[in-house]
Amino acid sequence: MADGSLTGGGLEAAAMAPERMGWAVEQELASLEKGLFQDEDSCSDCSYRDKPGSSLQSFMPEGKTFFPEIFQTNQLLFYERFRAYQDYILADCKASEVQEFTAEFLEKVLEPSGWRAVWHTNVFKVLVEITDVDFAALKAVVRLAEPYLCDSQVSTFTMECMKELLDLKEHRLPLQELWVVFDDSGVFDQTALAIEHVRFFYQNIWRSWDEEEEDEYDYFVRCVEPRLRLHYDILEDRVPSGLIVDYHNLLSQCEESYRKFLNLRSSLSNCNSDSEQENISMVEGLKLYSEMEQLKQKLKLIENPLLRYVFGYQKNSNIQAKGVRSSGQKITHVVSSTMMAGLLRSLLTDRLCQEPGEEEREIQFHSDPLSAINACFEGDTVIVCPGHYVVHGTFSIADSIELEGYGLPDDIVIEKRGKGDTFVDCTGADIKISGIKFVQHDAVEGILIVHRGKTTLENCVLQCETTGVTVRTSAEFLMKNSDLYGAKGAGIEIYPGSQCTLSDNGIHHCKEGILIKDFLDEHYDIPKISMVNNIIHNNEGYGVVLVKPTIFSDLQENAEDGTEENKALKIQTSGEPDVAERVDLEELIECATGKMELCARTDPSEQVEGNCEIVNELIAASTQKGQIKKKRLSELGITQADDNLMSQEMFVGIVGNQFKWNGKGSFGTFLF
């Protein structure tokens, strides 16, 4: 990323102050043969072709010293960087050829001498003149400019010290540390832009381990495009804040592991063969390598926009429950923007004084639902009166409370605005929500997450923005007579070890209807799923998707019907399912980047057979888990395993559901 200290905003302003660059315009192959950007038409956008001089903006570097203005090149749009890397710099090169291709690109567009730049590091800024360029090394040969201009955080950094430093570096500096001084003639526009692309690439795209990756297909498709998209998704607030933190932590861990791995490999090359120390180092090296591969796989899942939604991330909720009030009293909170006498009379009759003794119950009035939720203790009730309420924070519900609408859901609308995280965060032991319409805007996380405890949603409407409802491990979720739509990810995500009961709901117009996370790992419990009389329709992908690792696909093909595990898992249903589609990780990645389309499965009686298909696939997956556990116990010397331990009931029932007009069918499997 271009240094924010020089711009005051860095690339964070990219979406707000776009700058067009010369090579964003598509060039014909013939023009490339003449030399990239060597003629006026190829180095400036059509909006600048009739204007003399530079087509770029300039800005003054911050600091105590008055430096000359430099080119402002860090506010480029996604497609401008995309086209530059794809068409002109990297093309179809392999990871091992990146520096070579970059050097060839720079030879075509970079002025070899005659320009000035600000050499910028974390410690100082100094003005230099470029006398030559070592393209192969991506370095410039420089000398101090006259007059001498330097801005340093260290007062003792004198001109003599700077000369000594340059001598140590043989007057050769990395191009990415140079910021070209502005020249309104336009002669150095290409130079400034080319250096910006090199700088951005090595700061945001390149990883130190990339060269050691397999070169089966071009580096741009495999690494550059997904990382570039993720960078701009983060800039434009399309990625949850927690996931961004996870990504940067994974990067740091991977870099640290790779550094240790390189040091270990270097020490091994200097060891005597067959020594005890070498054997120990080799074991440690294998461990580091395995650790790195796992970290890199996690990074790839986050970098890919489709898999980012499919796998998500485990957000830890640190909400603390308040418990019961010290007085032991329970309070009813009434939410209304304005309280009319007639409304108050109806409330007293219908809700507040239904039982004897409720006349003594305390009532608090609020103008917005968020303040009411925040004021709740264990056992409180929140009654939301008809109206349209706009909130900007998260409903963090850690105590067992009831949140209910007084009227029809369409008359009681709670709308969340602002680029925050989750709309409703549930960690309470027994939370009940009913009769409310939740509307989400500009979100980067799901509309409702059940982290733990039990949450019941009844007679509600959920208008989603990103993912819909997420049911985490060990959580219980019950949804009845509700409508969920609009999720860009899955409408409902079900994690291993959770319980999910869905009855008489509509789930539609989402990316996927319901997504069941991988539960085949030995550390995971089988989820308990009940789906009765739901209508799952008009989703872009599948009605229901099961995510599981590729390594278990062979087991499924060889699984035998009628095993004890199958018998324990059977429910009241019949019918033979079609074979579920399987999509491996690479196909998913290609699909997400638009390189291929997943094949749609034809199922003429989809809404009838969909229930059977889901049941049979889940039974087969659960059977695999039982077989794997038996094998592991056998390896430990336990020859007679208790079948009851391995035949947990996955679901109470999957019956009466209708699957209509889902883009890829009623059921699919993601293999990763």
From Swiss-Prot:
It is found in: Midbody; Cytoplasm, Cytoskeleton, Spindle. InterPro entries: Beta_helix, PbH1, Pectin_lyas_fold, Pectin_lyase_fold/virulence, SHCBP1-like. The modification Phosphoserine is found at residues 5, 31, 42, 44, 47, 273, 634. SUPFAM superfamilies: Pectin lyase-like. GO terms for molecular function: SH2 domain binding. Keywords: Acetylation, Cytoplasm, Cytoskeleton, Phosphoprotein, Repeat. It comes from the Eukaryota. Pfam families: Beta_helix, SHCBP_N. The modification Phosphothreonine is found at residue 7. One of its GO terms (cellular component) is midbody. GO terms for biological process: fibroblast growth factor receptor signaling pathway; regulation of neural precursor cell proliferation. The modification N-acetylalanine is found at residue 2. Signal peptide: none annotated. PbH1 repeats lie at residues 428-451, 452-473, 474-496, 497-518, 526-548. Interacts directly with isoform p52shc of SHC1 via its SH2 domain. Interacts with TRIM71; leading to enhanced SHCBP1 protein stability. Interacts with both members of the centralspindlin complex, KIF23 and RACGAP1. May play a role in signaling pathways governing cellular proliferation, cell growth and differentiation. May be a component of a novel signaling pathway downstream of Shc. Acts as a positive regulator of FGF signaling in neural progenitor cells. This is SHC SH2 domain-binding protein 1. It comes from Homo sapiens. The lineage of its organism: Eukaryota, Metazoa, Chordata, Craniata, Vertebrata. The gene is SHCBP1.
